[in-house]
């Protein structure tokens, strides 16, 4: 199983600047558009410790141009560092106004309103950034600004030895398992949103004192966390823990829950269940005995 390290927060702002080249002949007028992007805490290229950063040359986004009624007109792969012109898109002249949504990494699909994103797919990152649609007028709108956010949920686990009966080095041998989650996020790329989660109940495992599991948004339901350490194991239901006095019932899109578990030779004490900087969802406390 893979161990995923994903920085804490998520919000990506993209500005598409369109600059018209002056020409008296409208048939030869070319209008360029350019993505000027920044990533405020997220998972993508060149990030700092808090998840902020920028896309780099040759990184790619998928832009989805759609009619106001929500039907796909054109899917377009934008590569950072290149210059593009509106007329390269070959958009139908009948559409005077369009909407544009986006995703990162790039996606090619014939069913953009129902795309299956499987977090177990080892060939791509488990994380997915989506931008809901904004309105544009081709060759008129000077700036298109897309707000990208994490579509998945981030569940972080951290073990901390008590330092008396157990040293931190011992925690590096722990096996951390997240199980009974639904692995497939059903995504509407045109809306830039996750519709539901589906698939057979699945597990992901990591070794060490820290792990991050990227999961589709879903009900906490039967989701379990298992800690195996020093020949012992403990399994607990996520839904039995609380955040600010309320049970954890839902793993929300774009949010992160962090469980900080203090470990001794006789017990685990869940001292922090806190929502980190993707966007905070909560923190919980409890104890588990080996």
For the regions a language model picked out, list residue spans one by one.
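Bacterial N-terminal signal peptides that target proteins for export
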Residues: 1-9
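C-terminal motif of bacterial Sec signal peptides marking the signal peptidase cleavage site
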Residues: 17-20
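Short, low-hydrophobicity acidic/polar segments
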Residues: 23-170, 177, 200-201, 205-211, ...
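Surface-exposed loop/edge segments in extracytoplasmic proteins
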Residues: 69-77, 167, 182-190, 196, ...
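Short, surface-exposed linear segments at secondary-structure transitions and domain or protein termini
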Residues: 82-88, 194-200, 242-258
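Edge beta-strands of extracellular beta-sandwich domains
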Residues: 111-117, 233-242
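Short, surface-exposed alpha-helix to beta-strand junction/turn motifs within ectodomains of secreted
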Residues: 172-184
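Hydrophilic extracytoplasmic domains
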Residues: 242-290
């Amino acid at each position: 199983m893979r161990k995923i390290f994903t920085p804490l927060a998520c919000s990506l702002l993209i500005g598409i600047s369109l600059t018209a080249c002056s020409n008296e002949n409208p048939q030869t007028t070319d209008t360029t558009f350019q993505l000027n992007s920044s990533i405020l805490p997220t998972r993508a290229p060149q990030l700092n410790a808090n998840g902020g950063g920028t896309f780099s040359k040759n990184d790619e986004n998928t832009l989805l141009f759609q009619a106001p009624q929500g039907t796909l007109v054109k899917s377009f792969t934008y590569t950072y560092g290149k210059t593009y012109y509106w007329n390269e898109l070959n958009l139908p002249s009948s559409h005077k106004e369009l909407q544009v949504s986006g995703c990162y990494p790039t996606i090619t699909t014939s069913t953009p309103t129902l795309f299956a994103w499987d977090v177990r797919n080892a060939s791509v990152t488990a994380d997915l950034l989506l931008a809901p649609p904004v309105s544009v007028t081709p060759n008129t709108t000077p700036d298109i600004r897309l707000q990208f956010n994490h579509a998945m949920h981030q569940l972080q686990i951290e073990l901390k030895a008590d330092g008396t009966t157990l040293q931190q080095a011992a925690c590096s041998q722990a096996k951390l398992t997240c199980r009974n989650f639904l692995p497939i996020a059903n995504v509407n790329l045109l809306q830039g949103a996750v519709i539901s989660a589906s698939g057979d109940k699945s597990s992901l495992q990591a070794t060490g004192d820290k792990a991050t599991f990227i999961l589709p948004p879903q009900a906490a339901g039967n989701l379990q966390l298992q800690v195996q350490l020093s020949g012992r194991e403990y399994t607990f239901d996520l839904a039995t823990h609380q955040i600010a006095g309320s049970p954890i019932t839902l793993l929300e899109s774009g949010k992160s829950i962090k469980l900080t578990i203090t470990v001794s030779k006789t017990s685990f004490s869940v001292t922090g269940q806190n929502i980190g900087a993707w966007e905070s969802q909560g923190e919980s406390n409890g104890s588990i005995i080996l």
